[in-house]
């Protein structure tokens, strides 16, 4: 059976950003958490289409490459798609551009569903669902064709999946920064170390990669 995967960025004091706006959908603190990842060769190639070979290699790049492997479907929240930027515009196709980096079916959790599905370049099709995350996960598994399902952000979607015990493989990228504000990822959520095997590795950038595998 396909596995449910999640990759999360967090600060060393356990925060994820909570300052998103329509003009800055990831929040001001997002770039501080993701600086090492966005500098990698894999990110530059997969997200920006840069095939020059520029970008960092090493531990961060190895985890970055694994991020894209074996994914057959994605689940994300409305904020990660960008619905909050143009909530009433039925022609809005999200802020990922004409060729999003997913290349799979993507299920967007939103209370504004039903909305028509949107087929993009490169194989990405956005489907909009107003349903519990475990129900949408069943649909995503069917669409994944035996490959894994990744649950993306934002914070609310990630916490819903963690609270429901849906995540088989969790990869935490802990940036060596203190935010002092935002969403506290682990409040009232415990026991992952008893249900998942925990490993950690420190990258050259100082980012701590923690993996929890069921």
Give the role of each language-model region.
Residues 1-214:
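Enzymes that bind and transform nitrogen-containing heteroaromatic metabolites
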């Amino acid at each position: 059976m396909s596995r449910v995967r999640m990759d999360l960025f967090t600060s060393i004091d356990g925060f994820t950003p909570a300052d998103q706006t329509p003009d800055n959908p990831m929040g001001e603190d997002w770039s501080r958490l993701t600086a090492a990842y966005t500098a990698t060769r894999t990110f530059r190639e997969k997200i920006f289409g840069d095939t020059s070979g520029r970008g960092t290699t090493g531990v961060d790049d190895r985890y970055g490459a694994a991020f894209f492997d074996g994914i057959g479907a994605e689940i994300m929240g409305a904020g990660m798609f960008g619905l909050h930027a143009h909530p009433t515009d039925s022609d809005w196709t999200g802020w990922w551009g004409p060729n999003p980096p997913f290349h799979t079916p993507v299920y967007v959790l939103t209370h504004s569903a039903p909305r028509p599905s949107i087929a993009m370049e490169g194989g990405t099709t956005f489907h909009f669902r107003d349903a519990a995350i475990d129900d949408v996960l069943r649909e995503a598994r069917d669409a994944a064709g035996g490959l894994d399902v990744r649950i993306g952000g934002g914070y609310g979607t990630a916490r819903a999946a963690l609270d429901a015990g849906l995540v088989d493989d969790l990869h935490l990228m802990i940036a060596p920064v203190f935010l002092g504000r935002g969403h506290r990822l682990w409040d009232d959520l415990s026991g992952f170390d008893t249900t998942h095997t925990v490993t950690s590795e420190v990258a050259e950038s100082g980012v701590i990669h923690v993996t929890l595998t069921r």
